[in-house]
Each structure stands twice: as structure tokens, then as C-alpha cells.
Amino acid sequence: MSDIEEVVEEYEEEEQEEAAVEEEEDWREDEDEQEEAAEEDAEAEAETEETRAEEDEEEEEAKEAEDGPMEESKPKPRSFMPNLVPPKIPDGERVDFDDIHRKRMEKDLNELQALIEAHFENRKKEEEELVSLKDRIERRRAERAEQQRIRNEREKERQNRLAEERARREEEENRRKAEDEARKKKALSNMMHFGGYIQKQAQTERKSGKRQTEREKKKKILAERRKVLAIDHLNEDQLREKAKELWQSIYNLEAEKFDLQEKFKQQKYEINVLRNRINDNQKVSKTRGKAKVTGRWK
């Protein structure tokens, strides 16, 4: 609530208090006037009653003078209408209008004071609620700003991570392409020099006078196929990729081994079947030959 509204409210309250005081003063003046009018009416009625009583007495005296001694012998009639005299209020039982007015003013003042206190209490509560609402709004705004900052930082980290991942993949792709190119060039150079290598091997075997056994050939082939594992210069992501690559190569080798074993089993089974057929055919041919010879000699 602004200062202007507070000043306006205070001015309105002062005007209401002044109007209440003026109404009370007017009400007091009206009561005084009514009391004065009531007193004047009572005095006028008393005076009229006194004048009437005096007139009645004078008329009775005149009648007595006219009637003479006849009326003196007659008994004097009693008047059935007594003289009406306004009752006078004793001093101890008089109504104190000032006291009534004072009590009423005190009551109105207390009610007004209670209304003013209730108004200020409500106003204080509203101000406290407004302050708490502002604090709540500021706290919520700060929390929202903090959440937005954290969200922006996470998004920035995610973008940086994606950029690093993209750069790493590009680097791996380039390195793989370079290795493939080098491997192809090496294979071509080996193919070009393969004939000379075979001749040299034959010459060395002829000179040595002995041939390599199958075990030695296997060891030599494995030594040529086995590659040196250089992982000292690789980071965590590259090591993870290298592990995946090795796992894939092992998986492929195991699959190839399984296929070769199944193929070997199939070939072994076929050899056994063919061998059994050959044995059966040889047995049948021997029995047929013996029967023919015996029949011929008979």
C-alpha cells in the first residue's frame, strides 16, 4: 500500500470522526431544546391550572354573595374535580440527560476505537501477507533462475561432449582409413615380393636339407597374424573402442572356429559313411566272385 493511499485513508478517518462529533453535538442541542420546551410546557400548564383554580374560587365567592343567607344555611357541596397540579419530579429522581449523552458518546467512541483498531490490524495483516507474498515470489524467481542456469550448464556440457565425441569419431575414422590404406599398400608390396620370398624360402630349405613341419608352419602363421597391442597412448574412450574391436575380432574368430569344427565333423561323418559303403561293396563283390568260380568248376 502506497503513502498516498495511507494519507487518503487517514484524512477520511478524520472527516468521519469530525462528522460523528458534529452529529453528537447536534443531537445534544436537540435534546437540550426538547428539555427546555418540555419545561416551558409544564410551566405553562401549571400557570393555566392555577389561573383556572383562581377563577373557580372567584366564581364561587360571587355566587355565595348573591345567594345570601340561604346558601349559608345549606351545606357547602364538595367539588368532585380536584385541582390538577402537575407532578413535580424530586431532585433525586431527575433524569440526567448529560450522563446518558456522555455514556452514549463513550459507547460510540469505544466502538469507533474498536473499528479503528480492527482496521489497523487488518491492514497490518495485509501488509504482512504482501511482504510474505513478495518474498515467496522473489524466492521462486531465484529458484527458477538457478534451475535455468543449471539447465544451460548441462546443455552446454552435453553439446561439448557431443562435439568431442564427433571429433573423436572423425579422428578414429581418419586413422582407420589411414591404417587401411597402409595395410593395402603393404599387401600390394608383399604380393609383389611374394614370388621372390617363395624362391628364397625354397633355396633355404634346399640348403638346410630339411622341411618345416606342420607345427612349425602353424607357429609361423600365428606369429605373422598376431599384432602388437599398443595401448599406452590411448585415452579412456579409445581404450573402450579398442576393447570393443578386440571383442568383435574374438567373436568372429570363435564363430569361424565353430563353423570349421562343424565342417570338420560333417566331413568326418561323410568319410565314415563313404568308408562303410566301400567296405560293404567290397564284401559284396568278394562273395559274388566266389560263387561264380565254384559254379564254373562244377
From Swiss-Prot:
Phosphorylation at Thr-213 by PRKCA induces significant reduction in myofilament calcium sensitivity and actomyosin ATPase activity. Belongs to the troponin T family. GO terms for biological process: cardiac muscle contraction; muscle filament sliding; negative regulation of ATP-dependent activity; positive regulation of ATP-dependent activity; regulation of heart contraction; regulation of muscle contraction; response to calcium ion; ventricular cardiac muscle tissue morphogenesis. The gene is TNNT2. GO terms for molecular function: actin binding; identical protein binding; tropomyosin binding; troponin C binding; troponin I binding. Troponin T is the tropomyosin-binding subunit of troponin, the thin filament regulatory complex which confers calcium-sensitivity to striated muscle actomyosin ATPase activity. The lineage of its organism: Eukaryota, Metazoa, Chordata, Craniata, Vertebrata. The modification N-acetylserine is found at S2. Heart. The fetal heart shows a greater expression in the atrium than in the ventricle, while the adult heart shows a greater expression in the ventricle than in the atrium. Isoform 6 predominates in normal adult heart. Isoforms 1, 7 and 8 are expressed in fetal heart. Isoform 7 is also expressed in failing adult heart. Residues 1-95, 120-219 are annotated as: Disordered. The modification Phosphoserine is found at S2, S208. It is linked to Cardiomyopathy, familial hypertrophic, 2: A hereditary heart disorder characterized by ventricular hypertrophy, which is usually asymmetric and often involves the interventricular septum. The symptoms include dyspnea, syncope, collapse, palpitations, and chest pain. They can be readily provoked by exercise. The disorder has inter- and intrafamilial variability ranging from benign to malignant forms with high risk of cardiac failure and sudden cardiac death. Keywords: Acetylation, Cardiomyopathy, Disease variant, Muscle protein, Phosphoprotein. It comes from Homo sapiens (Human). Residues 1-70 have a biased composition (Acidic residues). InterPro entries: TNNT, Troponin, Troponin_sf. The modification Phosphothreonine is found at T204, T213, T294. Residues 120-183, 203-219 have a biased composition (Basic and acidic residues). One of its GO terms (cellular component) is cardiac myofibril. It holds the Pfam family Troponin. This is Troponin T, cardiac muscle.
